[in-house]
Amino acid sequence: MARRWSTKESQRRGSAWLLLFLAGVYGNGALAELSENVHISGVSTACGESPEQIRAPSGIITSPGWPSDYPAQVNCSWLIRANPGEIITISFQDFDIQGSRRCTLDWLTIETYKNIESYRACGSTIPPPYISSQDHVWIRFHSDDSVSRKGFRLAYFSGKSEQPDCACDQFRCGNGKCIPEAWKCNSMDECGDSSDEEVCASDAHPPTTTAFQPCAYNQFQCLSRFTKVYTCLPESLKCDGNIDCLDLGDEIDCDMPTCGQWLKYFYGTFNSPNYPDFYPPGSNCTWLIDTGDHRKVILRFTDFKLDGTGYGDYVKIYDGLEENPRKLLRVLTAFDSHAPLTVVSSSGQIRVHFCADKVNAARGFNATYQVDGFCLPWEIPCGGNWGCYTEQQRCDGYWHCPNGRDEINCTMCQKEEFPCSRNGVCYPRSDRCNYQNHCPNGSDEKNCFFCQPGNFHCKNNRCVFESWVCDSQDDCGDGSDEENCPVIVPTRVITAAVIGSLICGLLLVIALGCTCKLYSLRMFERRSFETQLSRVEAELLRREAPPSYGQLIAQGLIPPVEDFPVCSPNQASVLENLRLAVRSQLGFTSIRLPMTGRSSNIWNRIFNFARSRHSGSLALVSGDGDEVVPSQSSSRETERSRPHRSLFSVESDDTDTENERRDTAGASGGVAAPLPQKVPPTTAVEATVGSGGNSSAQSTRGGHADGREVSSVEAPSVSPARHQLTSALSRMTQGLRWVRFTLGRSSSTTQNRSPLRQLDTAVSGREDDDDVEMLIPVSDGASDIDANDCSRPLLDLASDQVQGFRQPHSAGNPGVRTSNRDGPCERCGIVHTAQIPDTCLEATVKTETSDDEALLLC
């Protein structure tokens, strides 16, 4: 019996070592031989918060607990990464997941991109192979809290889509892709072009299932995982914790060994079944520790090694005797395979539960417990409540006592120095547990029950810098430095946000500036189009109509023709009609045409009006001599206060009807009557100017010779009237000189001006004045003027200052016509409107008068 046990133990140990280097791929009776870079799925972070990252070129992934039922409410994920430029091929070998419509209960997904599903499967049908388009693949498995099934088992292989040649254990597809030889003729298209299934019709045959002799009563039939053929194995290899059969038939449906006990002492020990040998698969043990003391219980695992294949084996430790999830202290798995492991309860009671799956096994664990402050019989107290240490732990280079008592005075180290190991290297206490290795083997940073100031103590008795706590990186190795961290935005994120905000603000300011600049340029262009024309452009664009034929004849520029209308006692001339129309529209007000847009300036208009009164400028339209003069002065003042009544064109007067002319009031409010004949008083002329009188007399006699009627009314011999006439003639002489000088200077710049334009010096000499005045020619109806003289326009007396001269003259001698502008020149007998001959100017009396008085024009 002892010999048999020895043989079984040796076989068990050999199988355990083989499991560390070999892995079988179970699928349709075929076995793929994988290299040392093969990944075998086990208990890992795949079913935790983060996915398990796999970088091996090939491997096997199984669901938790396969081939047993997977647990409920699990979420596992794997991330397979291949080399750049390679693709990943996944082939399912076993698949049994709870089925549902659209796979909403339990499901398996394969994704090329995270959170973007490209493949979802459930049920009992083996899915077809999956060939990725990228160098990475996400695999996710989910189960609900209802039905559980066997799960899945898949194999993956990564390589280039086209390769010139393949390895000896690989098959080259028709498209140049390489796959494992075991995938050939397995009724699945792993190549993508079905070339691995084309040559299977003739040579394909099922795995070796030839008949063999029945096994003995103490043997069982098994498909050997080593020879790939069915063989008979002794019953002793069944349920021994070692997998001998390819289908795991020797380790399935084994009876659970009884283990566990109730511990009621202040200290004690316990271990896994068969320790230090492998514990049986499917072990399920519970230890209840009740010291009967209120003090804490210290549980220490001196040796710990669990299996990690499948869902894995675990040890759960509870604070108390109840299996209460809220009082779970710690869960130990295959990833905690390091010693010592210490767990401290809050009371004198602890519950330890060990569970193993039915796949493979490991050495197990050995644990001790004791009440805080007590030591085991074979231990040495560290002093106070610092714990205990064994003789083997004395001077081994590792602190088993928090105060380092087990490492004091061990070697040739100085006082307050500790050895790194037995090689004689020492370090001071200040270098202990400061996250800086001073010993070659790092013993100064192991078993750190306390850390130096500025360091953080991890749950696995390691020390890290405090600045590394809650930095989103696992520096402790167990994630304890990232637990219970407040949600704080990293400084880098804040800096990036501030810089981004500044850049965005700067771009916004630049955009606003550009927008404002473009808007200003646009408005400037629009204003440039809307700007009023300058005075020069206005003069060039606003051409005046050429003078009429009658005006040219009246000015003496062309000789008269026979068929042109002439003045007669019974018919008014065309110019007289024009004069009457303008007078009816303006009410004896001077026509003032705006030169530029600045005519709206009231101050310039007031200034020009004052200048016209004091500088000798003449109004162009006046009332008749027979009309009441006092009302004319008040009417002129009233009309001057109307700035827009003068804005009428001369051409518009020709369209007035006869009724409008008849009904339009003149200066005195009546209808404008034909002008009376004018005979210059001979006595007054002779008294004033000799030569001028002779000329006037000759002109008068010439008129009588032609048969024209002349008024017989003579001028009164009253001395005041003669004095006023003399003063008026003197002022007329000065005005004629001024007009000659002005017209001579502006003749070169006003060639295109109409005779109806102004003769004001302010307008003809400068372009800055705003208003111009028109001289309206009139026609006299006297019969003593010949046809040529009647065709010429007559000047009207426009100065308000001569009213005193005209009123007494008319009042004293109603039969005699007062001296005004409506008449021929005393010198030549012609009515001058634009230019006055030099002979007429030389014949006038050179009498200087005040500028404040009105000037009479010939």
Swiss-Prot record:
Compartment(s): Membrane; Membrane, Coated pit
Residues of the CUB domain: 47-159, 259-372
A GO biological-process term: cell adhesion
Domain LDL-receptor class A: 165-201, 214-255, 374-411, 412-449, 450-486
Organism: Mus musculus (Mouse)
Biased composition (Low complexity): 712-721
UniProt record similarity statement: Belongs to the LDLR family.
Compositional bias (Polar residues): 746-755
Residues the record marks as carrying a glycan: 75, 284, 366, 409, 441
Signal peptide (from-to): 1-32
Regions of this protein lying in the Cytoplasmic compartment: 514-858
Protein name: Low-density lipoprotein receptor-related protein 12
Extracellular side: 33-492
Predominant location: membrane
GO molecular function, one term: integrin binding
Disulfide bonds: 47-76, 103-122, 166-178, 173-191, 185-200, 215-232, 222-245, 239-254, 259-285, 375-388, 382-401, 395-410, 413-426, 420-439, 433-448, 451-463, 458-476, 470-485
Transmembrane residue ranges: 493-513
